[in-house]
Amino acid sequence: MLDNQLLRENPQYVATQLLKRGFQFDAVTFSQLEEKRKALQVSTQSLQNERNLRSKAIGEAKSRGENIEPMREEVNKLGAKLEQQKTELDEILKQIEVISLSLPNIPHESVPVGKDELDNQEIRKWGDVPAFSFPVKSHDELGEALGQMDFALAAKITGSRFVVMKGHLARLHRALIQFMLDIHIQQHGYQEIYVPYIVNADSLLGTGQLPKFEADLFKLTGDNGYYLTSTSEIPVTNTVREMILSAEQLPIRYVCHSPCFRSEAGSYGKDTKGMIRQHQFEKVELVWITKPEDSYNALEQLTQHAEVILQRLNLPYRVVALCTGDIGAGSAKTYDLEVWLPSQNTYREISSCSNMEAFQARRMKARFRNPDTNEIQLVHTLNGSGLAVGRTLVAIMENYQDEHGNIHIPDALKPYLGGIDIISVK
C-alpha cells in the first residue's frame, strides 16, 4: 500500500510513476473522491458538534422545567442527517480503500523502464555454460529414464503439474533443502524459522496477495477463510505484523523452508511438462526486516546470498534487473537469478530477490521506534528465494548429465548423500 499522504497531496505524481509499470491510475477520480471525503468529514464533524450542543441544551432546559419537545425534534433531525452523512462518508472511504489496495508499488528510480521481460537488464553472469558432445536431455526425460521421476503417477493421484519422485532423486531433492539451510544459517547468519503453511486473509492482505491476486491461491473450504501459502514470504513477513520493534532488533533475517502451493492461474500452456511450473513445490525463502535507510544495501546482500548457492553447486547463472513492466506489484526493485538449462538453451528464473520498501509494512502496520527522533516509523521488508528447490534440482540434472543419462552429484552435495556421487541408469 502506498502512503496515503502522498496519494492525497500528489496523486498526479503517483499516476506518472505507476504509468512506468503500464498501470493506469485515475488521479482525477481519486482527487474528486478525496475532496468529497474532506467535505463530508468537515460536515459530519460540524453536525456532531451541533448535536452535542443541542443535546446539552435539552438537559439544561429540562432541569428548568421548560418544554423540550421542539428541541428534541431538532436534535432528532440533526441525528438523522448525521447518520446519512456518516453512511455517505463510509461509502467514500470504502471506495478510496479499494483504490488504494489495488495500487502497485512505485518503482525505485534505479529500476530500468520497460514494458516486459524483454526489457530486463542483465547485470552480471557467473560460470561457463557447459558444452556437451552429445544431445542433451531435459530433466523430465532424464528422471523418467532413471525410473525416479513419475509425472503420470502424480497425475493419477492428483492431476497435472505435480510429480512423484523416488529413490536417489527424492534424496537429492531433500539434500538440496538441507544444503541451502546450512549455508544460509551457518555462513550467512540467518535465523531459521518454522511457520504455518496455512494462512488467513489478514496475512495475505498484509503481504499484498489479497485482494488482487486471489486467483493465484488455493483457498480451503470451510468458514475459516484459510488459504494454502503460495510462498513462505507470507507467514514469515507477517511475524512482524502490528508490531513496534526496537531499532536494536533490526535487521531481522529469517530463512525458512516450506512447500508452496500455487494455482498458476494465467499460466495455461506455459511449461506444461516437467517440474518448472508446478502447483506444489519446495522453496527456501530469505526474509529481511530492516530500517528504511538500510534496505537497498540489504537487497544487494540478500541477492548475493542466493547467488552463493548456485556458485557452490557450480551452476551457470546470470543476475537480471527486472524492468518496471516486469516487477511484482509489491516490489520497488527486483533482481532475478536465472540458471542455465541446457535442454532449453536459455537461462530460467530460479530466484527473485525484492525490496518491497514500506509497501507491505504499511499494510501490516509493521513499525520500529527511531532512537534518534523517538518517532514510530515503518520498517522495510525484503524477500528472495534462496533457492527454489525443484528448479535447482532441474538445473543439476541437466547440467550434470552424461551421455548415458546418468546424473553426477555436485561436490558440495556429496556429504549429504552418504557418499553417492552418481545417480545411474539401471
Swiss-Prot record:
Q: Which residues bind L-serine?
A: T231, S232, E233, E285, S385
Residues binding ATP are R262, S263, E264, E349, I350, S351, S352
Cell location:
Cytoplasm
**Key word Aminoacyl-tRNA synthetase present in the record?**
yes
Q: Does the keyword Aminoacyl-tRNA synthetase apply?
A: yes
Q: Which Pfam families match?
A: Seryl_tRNA_N, tRNA-synt_2b
Q: Recorded E.C. number(s)?
A: 6.1.1.11
Q: Which reaction does it catalyse?
A: tRNA(Ser) + L-serine + ATP = L-seryl-tRNA(Ser) + AMP + diphosphate + H(+); tRNA(Sec) + L-serine + ATP = L-seryl-tRNA(Sec) + AMP + diphosphate + H(+)
Annotated keywords: Aminoacyl-tRNA synthetase, ATP-binding, Cytoplasm, Ligase, Nucleotide-binding, Protein biosynthesis
One GO cellular component term, please give it. Answer: cytoplasm
Pathway this chain belongs to: Aminoacyl-tRNA biosynthesis; selenocysteinyl-tRNA(Sec) biosynthesis; L-seryl-tRNA(Sec) from L-serine and tRNA(Sec): step 1/1
Under Gene Ontology molecular function, one entry of this record is: serine-tRNA ligase activity
Coiled-coil residue spans: none
Top-rank lineage group of the source organism: Bacteria
**Which family does the UniProt entry place this protein in?**
Belongs to the class-II aminoacyl-tRNA synthetase family. Type-1 seryl-tRNA synthetase subfamily.
Q: How does it assemble?
A: Homodimer. The tRNA molecule binds across the dimer.
UniProt cross-references to NCBIfam families, sorted A to Z:
serS
Q: What is this protein called?
A: Serine--tRNA ligase
According to the entry, what is the taxonomic lineage of the organism? Bacteria, Pseudomonadati, Pseudomonadota, Gammaproteobacteria, Legionellales
What gene does this protein come from? serS
